[in-house]
Design a protein with these regions (language model features):
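Short beta-strand scaffold segments in enzyme catalytic cores
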Residues: 25-41
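Short, basic/aromatic recognition patches
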Residues: 1-26
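Zn2+-dependent cytidine deaminase-like catalytic core
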Residues: 41-140
Length: 140
């Protein structure tokens, strides 16, 4: 599956997380791709979840991140051995300004320390994440 296609799909999911035009901040979405198919999605959530707390950097950082949500959901579809062969994609969208003409653009979605810990724990070697600017992406 093409990187750009997966990232654009995630950008749409992240954009639609909150339709409130007055909301500031960023939205994250992630996907696990295995054998050229998206097998799971994940999004940032404000509710706590024990799965993320296993990997968080701080004891109070227990909210489910898009990356850990996608990994958690993937484990319902594939084994941990198969997950090692999968690719994790992460996308962030954010507003380019605070004015009346603000638009959503891609942002840096490099996984945090806790998410990188989860990625390493499950042996995921290929991670692709969006970077600031339209269409930019990086490899972890």
């Amino acid at each position: 599956m093409e990187r750009e296609k997966v990232l654009h799909t995630l950008a749409k999911i992240a954009r639609d997380l909150d339709r409130d035009i007055n909301r500031t901040g960023a939205r994250h979405a992630a996907a696990v791709v295995y054998k050229n198919q998206i097998i799971s999605y994940g999004v940032n959530q404000r509710k706590s979840h024990p799965f993320h707390s296993r990997f968080s950097e701080h004891d109070d950082a227990i909210f489910l991140h898009a990356e850990t949500d996608a990994i958690k959901n993937a484990l319902r579809q594939i084994s941990e051995d198969e997950l090692e062969k999968a690719t994790l994609y992460v996308c962030r969208v954010k507003y380019d300004s605070n004015g009346p003409n603000k638009k959503l653009t891609w942002g840096n979605s490099k996984p945090c320390i806790g998410c990188r810990r989860a990625i390493a724990n499950f042996g995921i070697k290929d991670v692709i994440y969006s970077n600031d600017g339209v269409g930019n992406h990086c490899l972890l």
